[in-house]
Amino acid sequence: MPTWYVSKIARKKVKVVLSGDGGDELFAGYNHYTYLKKLHSFPLNFNSPQLSKFIWGSLHKAIPNNMVGKNASYLFSKGRNFLSAFVNMYSIDERKNMFQNEHIAINYSKGSELYKVEILKKGNKNDFVSNMQFLDLQTYMPDDILTKVDRASMMNSLEVRVPLLDHKFAELTFKIPSGLKMKENQSKYIFKKSMSGYLLESILNHPKQGFFYSSFTLVQR
């Protein structure tokens, strides 16, 4: 809905706009990359559900959600297999409660996980963060972000171009080690450095801010 409104306003002035979509996926801008990297490097065996759930469950109670982020908080509270938890936020049991047909719930869950696991196998096995970026770029980006923007903009006869997703540029970014994308807990490190001569510090160092709005509030208005 927010994208639809922005597109509607933009169309009053222009017919074509540029979008920054792809920046988070290409330069490790999402918070969950930081959290998942830390969890991945932790010596605890995530494939031991009982031990994992006990330890992370206790830790989850002691640390406020806003300090660890929703993704890490989810893993803490669930204590699930690490890979499974990342590629599929809902367990099979949880999906059974979402679908009326149990057969559909089980097969949908298995199919989704297997598909994403196959994508991860094609990624950089020696660079965990790059592998997670690759997964997002292959799934979340085309199936969510780009689809949402395309539908919202075209409903307002507005063309949105995505320069960061030029295939040559995207391929180049995956040759950059994740250590240059995430450095000292700063996301998009090398991207921000390269833009320092063109953008104000207030823009480069602005806290990350999601683009969303309460649907209930929008409907009320």
Predicted regions located by residue number:
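A short, charged helix-loop
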Residues: 108-121
